[in-house]
Each structure stands twice: as C-alpha cells, then as structure tokens.
Amino acid sequence: MTIAPTPDWNPRSDAVQQDQIAAYDHLRDQYGAAYSEMLHWSVLGHADVLRILQDHERFSNVVSRHVAVPNGMDPPEHTAYRALIEPYFTQERVEAFRPVCERITAELLQALQGRREVDWVAAFALPFAVRIQCAFMGWPMDLEAELTEWSARSHAATLAQDRPALDALAAQFEGIVARMLDERRASGADPQQDVTASLMHATVLGQPLGADAIASILRNWTVGEIGTISAAVGILAQWLAEHADLQATLRAEPARQPEAIDEILRLHGPLVTNRRVATCPVEVAGRQIPAGGRITLHWTSANRDPRVFEAPGEFRWGRNPQDNLLYGAGIHVCPGAALSRMELGVALRALLAAVASLAPTAQASEPAHYPAIGFARLPLQLRWA
C-alpha cells in the first residue's frame, strides 16, 4: 500500500485563490513539483512540463474514467482522433469564420456604447466566448444562458471536488448534446455547413463516431473554449487598462497586436492546468512519483519560469515564441490555436478601435477561482472613440 506524501500546499486555500499566479510562482521556486491532496503532483517548472508533454509513454493522458477525445488518449488512438479533428481548424476554416466573429464582437460593443463603466467579464468577455462557440458549432444563441450557468456550476463543483455534482453536470451536458443531435437528425442539417452535423457523419478507423465520442469532442469545444476565451479576453483588457502606453502602441501599430496577445497571456495564462498519470515510477524535480501517480501540469507557472524567461513578470517584446506554452506543446498541442488567435485578435482590434482609452475604476476586480483563472468581475472605465 502506497502512503500519500505530506501535502506541500492546499490549492483551495484563500491565499491561493486570491492570487493564483503568485501562489504558483512561489511553489515553482520553492519545490518545482509540489504535492497536494486535490491536485496530487503539481509540476511547475518549464523544463519539467515540457519533458512530460513530450513523453506519453511514461506520462499518459488516459487519466479519467470518462471518454475524453482526443486529450484523454495516447497514441495510436490519439493519432487517429487527432487526424479527425484537425481539419475543423484549418486556416481556411478559421478565415471563413472570421466575419461571424467580427459580427458578434461588433454587436456586443454596440450594446455597450455610451456606458462609461462596465463589468467587462459580464458585459463582454463571457458572452463573447459563449456566442462565438455556439456560432462555430452551429448551435442556437438561446443556449447562452444555459451554457453560462453550466460553466459556472462546473467550476464550483471542480473546486469543491463534488463528485455527485460533477456527474450530474456531465449528464446535463450530454442532454444538451443529445438535443443538438436530435435537431440535426430531424432537420437533415448539411454536414458541409454545420460542424455538429459533420461530426455525426465522421468516421475514425472506418467506424462512425459513437455518441460518447461526439459528446466528448463537443464538450471540449464548448466548455474548454468558453473558459479559456472568456478568461483571455478579460486578462487582455485588464492588462491594457493598467498599461496605457501599451494601449497606445497597439493602436498605432496594430500589426504588433498578435505578439502582444501571446506575451500578455504568457504573463497571466487563461488555462491553469492539464492532467497526466505516471505509467511507471519516475523522478520529477527531485520528487519520486510512483506508477499510477496523478500529475497536474501548471501552464501558468511554467510560462513564468525565470530559467526560461528573463524578468518573467515583465511584458517584453521579442521573446522566443517557441518557449511560450500558451497552446501547449508536443502531440497534444492545442488544435484550435489558430482559431483562438483569430478570435482574440478580432476582439482586441475591435476594442481598441471602439474606445479611446481603457482604464481601471475605483472598484476592485474579483479573481476567478480554480479551475478558472483571470477575473470573475472586472470593472473597467471606457472612453469611447
């Protein structure tokens, strides 16, 4: 019988949840790999995270009893499903979706016109993320409230480690997917024009996708993207509100916006962690992890490692983009990176064009709690152009 190590930290503590970035920086510098009852072995250094990402034989992605396509798979199964998914995120498809993203962005900003103070998360970041994902998958916009509530309840249940609630939420999402599939069967939706209908006709290794696989893919494309895109849009707005000089630079030189987005999101990542499991006894950052040991990779910490990024807490132009783990690395690198970059670029460019200045207000922001990051509430002052 394996005896669990004495915990090094508590991910649910108030101190961690009030400032996740500072907490993970401290853990990385003190431990490299730190144990907790909730997250088990948290790996925090850039080199260690990269090593694990590139070694699926010793660090498996098969971490859940639920189907997770393709992020919960290892080769060769992962390879087959990845080949199915990647065509949905080609540059051609991304550019075809750009006008839809621009329309949604314009509608949200138009609704805010004239308001001098807003909670940016509630007024823009969250509805933007939900609406663009619904549009991408061909889902109706009247799902916005249900998906927003579902996402919030899922985050709360994850932090509380409430297994019955998580199971109920999984069943609820499967119900949403079932409704979407039934609607397409009834209407004869064109798989060439509708992403969800296309998945219903897809095959892997000569076999049609099962209902569990379709639900898993759609869950990744909704839950994952809603959380990370809304967090990213909030983080970008907060950083620019605090740095008027960078605002001015990006208005004057819009071609620099893509690099700025990636650097801001290196400083304050929109995704906190991913999971792995050790398939054999391994040593990571001087800690002994047994076979079957649960591992949590901390993107936010790895991307602020001073051994890779000089002055890691500073915004700097010209950093090596290959070092930035914003979209992961290795065989599980985010297949939707081009889509996410387009969406964030559209949102930022439109915001900077619509407002002459973006600034903090006297009200304090509220941090989002794990597994989310960024802001639960972000009061901003807008001066319209």
Provide a role label for each language-model segment.
Residues M1-A385:
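Cytochrome P450
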